[in-house]
Amino acid sequence: VFLIMSGGIGVGNAGAICDEILRRHSGAFTVYILVGRNSDLKQTLEEKYAGNEHVRIVTFTKKVNVYMNAADVMISKPGGLTSTEAAVAQVPLVQLLVYTACEAPNIAFFSSHGLSERAENAADAAEKAVALVRDKARAEAMREAQRNTIAPNAADKIAERIVLS
């Protein structure tokens, strides 16, 4: 399962990334594209991939964690919350800096700590995602870095410290 996240408002080049995955990967697989609340993007992608058994378009959902837990790899912009959620879910992550310079520190941190791979464009993102799906050791090394770097219960620890102090 490939998961392409375009954010809550549905930005980025999800279609180009999907095209590259379809070109590079074969066999039994599904690409889920989460388009958020962007109805224009949803319509465009549904028309483009009508009849394609490998592609599913998903609008805004509160069940992102379910998609993350099912994914073999996720491609997303480097938003802080989404990136951290991916690391907590231990899903191999490819980050593509789409449009905001404020997310540049996120991609620098995640990629330098082995929590993600940085992609320069749609083709690069697809290439890295397919490589992570095919190379189980590479994907597991990223999961291990995620386990060792991101504390999934950090909020509980902070609350406990506040209550006990």
Give, region by region, the residue ranges found by the protein language model.
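A short alpha->beta transition loop at the rim of the catalytic pocket in nucleotide-sugar-dependent
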Residues: 71-72, 90-92
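A short, well-ordered alpha-helix in the C-terminal region of glycosyltransferases
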Residues: 138-152
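C-terminal "capping" alpha-helix adjacent to the active site of nucleotide-linked donor transferases
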Residues: 111-137
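C-terminal alpha-helical cap of glycosyltransferases
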Residues: 151-165
